[in-house]
From Swiss-Prot:
Function, in words: Promotes leaf senescence.
Gene that this polypeptide is encoded by: LARP1B
Organism from which the protein derives: Arabidopsis thaliana
Annotated GO biological process: leaf senescence
A single GO cellular-component term on record: cytoplasm
Official protein name in the record: La-related protein 1B
Sequence similarity: Belongs to the LARP family.
PROSITE patterns for the chain: HTH_LA (PS50961)
Amino acid sequence: MATTASSAANSASRFSIDSSISRSRHGDSSPWLLPSDSHDHPTLSLSQDDPFSAPSVSPPTGNNSSDYDNADKKPPPVWNMPSSNSSSDVGPVMGAAESWPALSLSARSSSIKSPSLDASKPFPDGSSSSIPPPQATSNTSTNANAGSSVSATSSENSAVNNSQRKPFRRNNNTSSSSTSSNVSNAAPLNTRDQNHSQRGGGSFGSGNFRNSQRNRNSSSYPRGEGLHHGNRRNYEHGNQSGFSHRNYSGRDMHLQPQRGVGMIRPQMLMGPPSFPASSAQYMAAPQLGSYGGPIIYPDYAQHVFMPHPSPDPMGLVGPFPLQPMYFRNFDAILYNKILTQVEYYFSADNLSRDEHLRDQMNDEGWVPVRVIAAFRRLAELTNNIQTILEALRSSEVVEIQGETLRRRGDWDKYLLPREPSRSGPAAGASNNASLVSQIESMTLSERSREGV
C-alpha cells in the first residue's frame, strides 16, 4: 500500500506540472478562478481546456495557510498550487462536487467534443489499461486535470481490478471503441455525474468496466461448449424426456425399449358385453393396432384400432333380460293350517266315525272340494278353492284329482254299502195303475169344462 501511495503522489505531481504548462499557453485569466476566503474548506479546481473532467479537491494544509496571512497580497490561482502528497490519502469531501459551471462556459463547452482516454498511459502499478483515455480532437495534449482528480481513487482500485480488466483486451476491443465513440458524440455531462462516479470509488472507465463485465458474462461460454447455444438440447426448460428439437429428422433419438410389435404399448380393448352368469365369460385378448404410434412420441396412443373377432355369431348381441319369476303371495302359516285340517278329515280315525263324509263319496271314493270347504273349521281359515288345492299339493295323506279329493291307499275300506233297487211285476203294476188314474182324472176335468 505504501508503494501504491507513493506512485499516486508522483503521478499527481507530474499531472499538476503539466497542467501549469498548459495554462501558461492559454493564459491565466479564466472565469473559473475562485479566490479562497476561508482556510477551513477544501479548494475546488476545474480545467479550462476540459470542462468535463472531474474537479480536483485538495484539503487544507499548514503550508497553504501561511500564504494567505497577508491580506494585501493577491491570492494565487487555485490550480497554480502544486498538489500535496496528502491528496492521495484523503478522499473527496462531501459537498465539494455540488459546484456548477457558469452559463457562459457551459454554452461554449457544448461545442467541444468529449475527450477519450489515452490507452498509452500506464497505471500506477505498471500495468497498461485496456480502456483508451479520452483525447481532444482539436488539441493533442492529454487531460492532466482529469488524471490528477481520479489518480487517488484509481490507484487503489487498479491493483484490485487489474486482473478483472485484462480479459477485456481479448474480448471487448470492439465494445470499448464503440463506447468511446458514443461518449465523444454524447451531450456534455455536468460535474454532478462525474463526481458521483468519483464517490463510488471508480474512474471514468468504471461504467465501461461494468458494461464489459456484463458482456463478458453473457459470452463466457464459447460456442460448442457448455449450453450448446445454437443447437443446444433444451433439457432445462421442461423437456425432460430427452428429445431435442432436432429429432424430427430421425437423428439423435433416445427411444425407449420396445414393448411390443411396432414400438407401441399393447392397448387393452373392451371385450363384448357380458353374458348371464350361467354361460362362460369371454375375455378378449389385448389387440395390437396395425399402425404404430409416432416415433417422436413413443408413448402416444395409437389412432387406428383393429376389431377383434367375436366369440360367436351373436357376439355383439347383449344378454336377454331375465323374465321375472312369479311368486304367488301365500302365507306359510295359513297353508300349514289348511293342510293339517284337511288331513284330519281324511284320517282313519275320522272316517270310521264320520258317516256324513263317507256318504259324500262316489263309487271310487272321491269327494268334491266344495263339500270339504263347507266344513266349519276349514271355512274359518279360507273359502277359496284354489288356496285349498295349493295347500294340499304337498300332502302325503290326501291326493288331488281336479277339484275332488280322496284318501291315499285304502280309500275303498270306507265306502258305504248301497241298497238294492226295487224290481218285479208288482212294482210295474202299481206304476201303471197310478198312470191310468192320472189319465182318468184329466178326462173328467175336461168334460166338466165342456158341460159348463
